[in-house]
Amino acid sequence: MTSNASVRRKFMTTGAVAGAATLGFPAIVKAQTTSLRFQSTWPAKDIFHEYANDFAKKVNDMTGGELKIEVLPAGSVVPAFGLLDAVSKGTLDGGHGVVVYHYGKNSALALWGSGPAFGMDANMLLSWHKYGGGKALLDKLYTAVGANVYSYVYGPMPTQPLGWFKKPI
């Protein structure tokens, strides 16, 4: 009978040590992938849509696949000019487009456009946005139009020409 008691004690001791060891080690859980659906305001073959895809690839690679961004071309879910509302309402998780597309909601959003050459060039606009109060103003404007979004500038849009005319103006 002594040997049975000894076996039971050894079993209980081993079990207690194994239990303590199990509790002592952190549980390693594989993180689940978070998937986000973005849409751009550009057709699939447009260079700016490619920029959006490049951004998504960088994020996907940096997170080791834990965050996966899918970028859809314009019109896949909503028309290009409906992108801000779709993101704001949660229909899409994010978007890639031009701020000036929302000019109809507040004319001050035209400041982020690529207007004629007598305005700020792309680098000046980026500098003003980051260091001159532009970001704070954009946040206020989006709040004023009821947009529930967080925005950041991904890159500059080159200045577009004023126009093409048959006769000098």
Positions of the model-derived regions?
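Immediate post-signal peptide segment of exported/extracytoplasmic ligand-binding proteins
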Residues: G24-S40, D61-K68, K167-I169
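Stable alpha-helical elements in mature extracytoplasmic
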Residues: Y51, F55, P79-L83, G134-L137
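Alpha-to-beta junction loops
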Residues: G65-L67, L83-G97
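Extracytoplasmic "Venus flytrap"
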Residues: R37-D54, A74-V78
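Contiguous mixed-secondary-structure segments that line small-molecule binding/active-site clefts
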Residues: T2-S3, S88, V98-I169
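N-terminal export signals
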Residues: S3-N4, K10-A31
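Generic structural signal for residues in well-ordered beta-strands
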Residues: I69-V71, V149
